[in-house]
């Protein structure tokens, strides 16, 4: 279950109902998908083959189709980051640069953890700490950045409005 940390006042929101309400008020789509249907050999697997990635997409194909139909998404893929990822530290430095996109940035966490820091409507940033089963859509034009939690590993399905993917605007 996602948790929220508001930067300026270092306040945490951990209750599921309160997290959902907070994100809805900020215009952030949040859903919880059933992660238990992921096959055991794909859980906490950060060295994915193309076949593994295709299998992950197949497992969640109904959910992907549903959110895509509701929100106009056209493409998706699977990414994996861990300490075995070449140049992970350089990638994280790049990910942590505040930016926005002209379309939604959507991620579903399959394994591991991630954090989206998002600028709220009041101008203060808040973290959305994501766990397996969490789907988030950062709204278009919302300033944000992404990083990993202390375990430094994540497998995520990325869902895009266009087949070209997101273009960051710094």
Curated annotation (Swiss-Prot):
Fe(2+) binds at residues 99, 101, 105, 144. The record marks 104 as: May play a role in transmitting local conformational changes. Its cofactor is Fe(2+); Ni(2+). This is Acireductone dioxygenase. Catalyzes 2 different reactions between oxygen and the acireductone 1,2-dihydroxy-3-keto-5-methylthiopentene (DHK-MTPene) depending upon the metal bound in the active site. Fe-containing acireductone dioxygenase (Fe-ARD) produces formate and 2-keto-4-methylthiobutyrate (KMTB), the alpha-ketoacid precursor of methionine in the methionine recycle pathway. Ni-containing acireductone dioxygenase (Ni-ARD) produces methylthiopropionate, carbon monoxide and formate, and does not lie on the methionine recycle pathway. The record marks 98 as: May play a role in metal incorporation in vivo. InterPro entries: ARD, ARD_bac, RmlC-like_jellyroll, RmlC_Cupin_sf. Pathway: Amino-acid biosynthesis; L-methionine biosynthesis via salvage pathway; L-methionine from S-methyl-5-thio-alpha-D-ribose 1-phosphate: step 5/6. Gene3D superfamilies: Jelly Rolls (2.60.120.10). GO terms for biological process: L-methionine salvage from methylthioadenosine; L-methionine salvage from S-adenosylmethionine.
């Amino acid at each position: 279950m996602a948790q929220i940390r508001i930067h300026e006042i270092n306040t945490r929101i951990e209750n599921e109902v309160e997290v959902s309400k907070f994100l809805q008020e900020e215009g952030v789509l949040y859903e919880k998908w059933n992660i238990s249907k992921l096959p055991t050999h794909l859980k906490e697997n950060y060295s994915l083959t193309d076949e593994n990635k295709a299998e992950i997409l197949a497992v969640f194909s109904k959910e992907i189709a549903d959110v895509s139909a509701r929100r106009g998404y056209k493409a998706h893929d699977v990414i994996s980051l861990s300490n075995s990822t070449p140049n992970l530290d350089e990638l994280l430095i790049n990910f942590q640069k505040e930016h926005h996109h002209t379309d939604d940035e959507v991620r579903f966490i399959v394994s591991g953890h991630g954090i989206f820091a998002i600028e709220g409507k009041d101008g203060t940033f808040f973290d959305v700490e994501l766990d397996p089963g969490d789907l988030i859509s950062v709204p278009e034009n919302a300033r944000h950045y992404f990083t990993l939690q202390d375990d430094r590993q994540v497998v995520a399905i990325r869902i895009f409005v266009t087949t070209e993917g997101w273009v960051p605007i710094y």
